[in-house]
Design a protein with these regions (language model features):
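Nucleotide/phosphate-binding catalytic cleft detector across ATP-hydrolyzing
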Residues: 1-11, 19-140, 151-189
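Primarily the dimerization/phosphotransfer
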Residues: 14
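Acidic, divalent-metal-coordinating active-site segment for phosphoryl/phosphodiester hydrolysis
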Residues: 146-149
Length: 189
């Protein structure tokens, strides 16, 4: 296999990111570029299940910027995935179709299990000591914008995993709502 250039796009609750890699059998993979754009997609989604038009516009502009970068790097293949914010939309198919029409990107909405499986897979690929670390009882916490994932490993296997809808963006939203309705907010927190 010759060298191939691949882009991984993550549409998350509070950030849209893209990593571009060079892949080959000889060297494995090498990161060429890492771009992150702060965009709180989960903000409206977690409270009302909707992505407002302005937020969709900014998302599509960002993805079109990513597309130009991909062309500059000669990207041959890509994978664009949406997580919690897109997963919890009341109209995910309509939003994914809008993204496709406006950017040309086919976005795959990952289930919670798929999202975390890919996360562990990437940790295992990057962290040399990962396999050794999960031989003995190990907990991995993944704090995202929409959820907190707790996974327990033992003897090189995933024993159990639990996802709690307590991500940083959700908690911040709840605290902001609480602050508006509570007299002694500072004492409560």
């Amino acid at each position: 296999m010759a060298v191939m250039t691949f882009a991984a796009i993550d549409i998350g609750s509070y950030e849209v990111s893209m990593k571009i890699f060079e892949l080959s059998k000889k060297i494995g993979f090498r990161e060429l570029n890492d771009v992150r754009y702060s965009l709180e997609l989960g903000k409206g989604v977690y409270s009302n299940g909707k992505l407002d038009t302005q937020m969709l516009d900014v998302l599509c502009e960002t993805l079109n910027d990513f597309k130009r970068m991909m062309q500059d790097f000669g990207v041959v293949e890509y994978r664009a995935c949406g997580t919690s914010a897109l997963r919890e939309l009341t109209n995910p198919l309509i939003i994914v179709e809008q993204i496709y029409r406006r950017t040309g990107f086919k976005v795959e909405i990952l289930s919670n299990a798929e999202q975390h499986f890919l996360g562990y897979k990437s940790i295992a690929a990057i962290e040399r000591g990962f396999k050794k670390m999960i031989q003995k009882g190990t907990a991995i916490l993944d704090v995202g914008g929409g959820s907190l994932q707790v996974s327990l490993f033992d003897k090189d296997a995933l024993v159990t995993t639990q996802s709690l809808k307590m991500g940083s963006l959700r908690i911040r939203q709840r605290l902001q709502e609480l602050e508006k309705t509570t007299i002694h907010y500072d004492k409560l927190v």
